[in-house]
Amino acid sequence: MNVPLGGIWLWLPLLLTWLTPEVSSSWWYMRATGGSSRVMCDNVPGLVSRQRQLCHRHPDVMRAIGLGVAEWTAECQHQFRQHRWNCNTLDRDHSLFGRVLLRSSRESAFVYAISSAGVVFAITRACSQGELKSCSCDPKKKGSAKDSKGTFDWGGCSDNIDYGIKFARAFVDAKERKGKDARALMNLHNNRAGRKAVKRFLKQECKCHGVSGSCTLRTCWLAMADFRKTGDYLWRKYNGAIQVVMNQDGTGFTVANKRFKKPTKNDLVYFENSPDYCIRDREAGSLGTAGRVCNLTSRGMDSCEVMCCGRGYDTSHVTRMTKCECKFHWCCAVRCQDCLEALDVHTCKAPKSADWATPT
């Protein structure tokens, strides 16, 4: 294909996307790295100098981030549990997810957002629990304040989410800030959306003081909601993610389809359409759906028709132990019998002429 020299600028956004370097966030591998801070900081491959600097300087924060990886990957797997790609991780791959996230897809957008959110959540929680030397409860929440119910006193331990966001931005964004390509800008946008999502669900909790529990005096504090709320919110953003292209000057995005609105800071953005994830594809990083359990009665993404990509399914007759004939006994216990339950389990057939992966 011959492209006139004057048309190079029109193709630049596409070239930026195609020529994106490997972009996996190496810090995700901190989940699998134990030992001292020096061992951890020096054995996570791919950390940029700023990340290593923060790692050596704040080993307690790194431990919190490492523990948080398990939490946000579990949340990712919960949200994608009924989909062909189920956020499966690869234990021996330092990118954690393999090649699948090299594509600038919706799935990549979600993973970068949920991982960034997970760092904010993990650090903020560790601050409140007194596990970090560099932070504690929110120091700004002192004295008296007013809300719709009247005057209250700040007390207890308000979650210091501003510290969590600040550290997450410095650590997580460090690698992307070194790059000027389209994918780096996409990651930075989705990282920020993830951080903002956690703060969105910060809620005020109060305790009443007074005679017989009356609320003549209130003590209040700010607390993060359960991480599931953040996961559910980002899942909705995933389903409404906006496909974008780079501006000609390479400084920002425009929508790929002019009928859609410009993305806000809360929206997820992506460049490339997702593969169908039906078959094992090493280049795309897809493990396929062969061997995956499907739902014969569903009409959704977990249905055997959709999950198995029209290849059909195998049915196995299995038995499992369940609790049955449960009765309440005064006071205060529920006693159940152990019963064997017979059920059919449906799993997707493998492609007839393909090398396929073990069940995912």
Swiss-Prot record:
Alphabetical list of SMART domains matching this protein: WNT1
Biological processes per GO annotation: atrial cardiac muscle tissue morphogenesis; canonical Wnt signaling pathway; cardiac epithelial to mesenchymal transition; cardiac muscle cell proliferation; cell proliferation in midbrain; cell-cell signaling; cellular response to transforming growth factor beta stimulus; epithelial cell proliferation
UniProt tissue specificity: In embryos in the developing allantois, pericardium heart, and ventral-lateral mesoderm; in adults in lung, brain, heart and placenta.
Bilayer-spanning residue ranges: none
Keywords, ordered alphabetically: Developmental protein, Disulfide bond, Extracellular matrix, Glycoprotein, Lipoprotein, Secreted, Signal, Wnt signaling pathway
Pfam family, one: wnt
Keyword presence, Ribonucleoprotein: no
Inactivation phenotype: Nearly complete perinatal lethality within minutes after birth, due to lung hypoplasia. About 4% survive for more than 30 days. Combined disruption of Wnt2 and Wnt2b leads to lung agenesis and loss of trachea development. In contrast, development of liver, stomach, intestine, pancreas and kidneys appears grossly normal.
Protein name: Protein Wnt-2
Chain's gene name: Wnt2
